[in-house]
Amino acid sequence: MYDYTYDIETGGLLLSERISQLSNEPRPVYAAELNLLGMDKYWRFDQQNETPYMWSEACNYIYRGTKVAKIKGGALCQAPVLELVHTKADDGDATLALPQGTTLLAVDIPAMVERNKDALSIVEQITVKKIYDYYKRYKDKLDCFHVAFSGGKDSVVLLELVKRALPRSSFMVVFGDTGMEFSDTYRIIDQEEAICRKDGIEFHRARSHFDPMDSWRLFGPPSNVLRWCCSVHKSAPQTLKIREVLAKGDYVGADFVGVRAQESVRRADYEYENYGKKQRGQYSLNPLLEWSSAEIWLYIFANALPINDAYKKGNSRAGCLLCPMGGGKADYFRHAAYGKEIDRYTDTIRELIDDKSIDTYVTNGGWISRRNGRDIKGNVSNYIEEVKDGYLYMIIPKPKTSWTEWMKTLADPPTSLYVEQRKEGLVARISAELNKTSIAKQVKQIFHKVAYCGACRVCEANCPYGYISFEGGLHIDDRCVKCGKCRQIEDGCLLYHSLQLPKNGGRVMKSLNTFADHAPKYEWVRDFYERGDEFFQNNSLGPMQISMFKRFLSDAQLAEKNKVTEFMLLTKRIGWESDSAWGLILIQLVYENPQIRWYIDNMPVNERMPRTYL
């Protein structure tokens, strides 16, 4: 809401009267992080972690209003490089912005809080009123309200605000325990659970029936495209837990969520209120949407709210131990703090992935870019499609669940559908004329489930009526209304989506020439960046050109299914013509495109060679 500046006197933040349009997301920096980055070699400070000494914005470190250091690079097992900031004196000589040997003063928390109390009071009152007004509007229409609690800074503030806005008996708190949280997060959860129970507030922990190690081995490592982990380990267990608590399979509730618009490009498009965006069939309110991290931290200090020690160790977010949406220096800080726990997951990646450069694949985040089951050891397709003699055949060598149960969810099965058990497995067929139709898509989704379903229970959570159960095996109630929400998942089944192989099986590559004679041109890329999603609806490229260019955009992770990606938006912000942006794009291409990978593997560095040689 408010913009901020740095207060030289207190060493803290100072909210201004201006409304913030963009925040650099400041966070406090404690002694543990200073030591980790090697700043103890240059400046003196007490080895205490109760009060911060500096603030960090992205890669920059600010001490009492002056940028004194910055870091570059960093990866899972590679520390970022620390660079001290120099300033030029009048005589032209460069000196350290903060002289070596300086004794750092801790932030004066009480003074900082006092100087911000009026602005914080306004922010608090506005947010509390929004929460109460929302509750008042829906309290007679919904079965429950709950706070989605993660143990991070935003959810700690959110819970405090909801406590101030609503009667203690009117809501519950639900912690979505992925089983992959920081150990420091579990300490915060224990602490908050005890406080809630003392205050008469229901507190529940929701956890998947899968152990994370088992789900990683079942699905393969998650990635920024294959984000099965959030559904399997977070959203679905929360829905199922609330059904259990309320003893109502078709409950409709509202959750208070601590997302903020300034956290990421994607979240910048979130709305205050929504229906079905976070969890199908449920309402959500994002009370902190317009808060900046400056206001979050000031509110925490002003109200002496608990701070997850993960932040004191350099982590900007308190999430999962190894997240496909992370990478870079964030991975370094995580590993430095929780190395043994994280190594369990990196060892699992090594166990599962078939890559000759597996160490680089792990440490540089190649696993983050996984897009199918191609590189998973021993992965053989359990679903095969072929068109023959006027029919589309779906062949399932080893069915995992009953096709007749899943077929209950389909309103109008095609009259041409025929299913039989053959020696090669379960074989279903429909008329080939239906292949590109909506009904064929639905039938395929059902047989994806038949072939791959691992009882992750996401379909069960998606059913708004509670008509799907996996107790003792798959069972779909005959009262199913055939709404199709159980199929509103990527490819109808998360496990199929994660393990499916490319159409050619992903192993035999006929040619390295992945772009035929239509390598991407500057004009195409410029047009794509200027027009975004609109580019796919109207462009000047021919059929083969657009096909090859889509391959390029997909391999570079700039677009997927005719939609620009968050990575594209990031490179656009950096400046798509810059070396930095193209360096990032090249990294993606190396992992995904065999032609680019071949160049990297076979061409010597810093040498010119004729095209004919290549």
Predicted regions, residues:
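Nucleotide-activated chemistry modules centered on ATP-dependent adenylation/adenylyltransferase
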Residues: M1-A148, K153-F447, S498-K503
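Short, solvent-exposed segments of well-ordered alpha helices
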Residues: D118, G314, V450, D477, ...
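Residue-level signal for threonine
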Residues: F182, P306-I307, I476-D477, N562-K572
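Short linker/helix segments within small regulatory modules
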Residues: K312-N315, S469-C483
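Cysteine-cluster motifs in flexible loop/terminal segments that predominantly coordinate metals
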Residues: R317-Y332, C453-C459, C483-C486, C493
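C-terminal accessory/binding modules appended to enzymatic or scaffolding proteins
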Residues: I446-P464
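Iron-sulfur cluster-binding cysteine motifs and their immediate structural context
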Residues: V458-L474, K485-L501
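Donor-sugar nucleotide-binding helix/loop cap in glycosyltransferases
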Residues: K503-L614
